[in-house]
């Protein structure tokens, strides 16, 4: 019975640590960039978009496709950074679970 209590305490401790790491990650800022940094997309670690900025050179009413492509590039870059940081931050807990 004591072993089960220890496992529960350990699980609760890990849960608190995970929650703190998630909060830390959510507070971080990630900036994704397109080719030549013409478009930047800024997100928080919990994948909420903060801003998207365009350099004047990329804004051409006759070429909206390029603007769209670069916007997609910047957003995907930021999201990939968040995913990588999440793996590094939260992956450490996988081997520590008591069950």
Swiss-Prot record:
Q: Name one GO molecular function term.
A: DNA binding
The entry's function note states: Binds to DNA and alters its conformation. May be involved in regulation of gene expression, nucleoid organization and DNA protection.
Q: What is this protein called?
A: Nucleoid-associated protein SUB1611
Q: How does it assemble?
A: Homodimer.
Q: Provide the taxonomic classification.
A: Bacteria, Bacillati, Bacillota, Bacilli, Lactobacillales
Q: Which domain of life is it from?
A: Bacteria
Q: Which organism is it from?
A: Streptococcus uberis (strain ATCC BAA-854 / 0140J)
Gene3D superfamilies found in the cross-reference section: Nucleoid-associated protein YbaB-like domain
Q: Which UniProt keywords apply?
A: Cytoplasm, DNA-binding
Hey, what's the signal peptide range on this chain? Answer: none
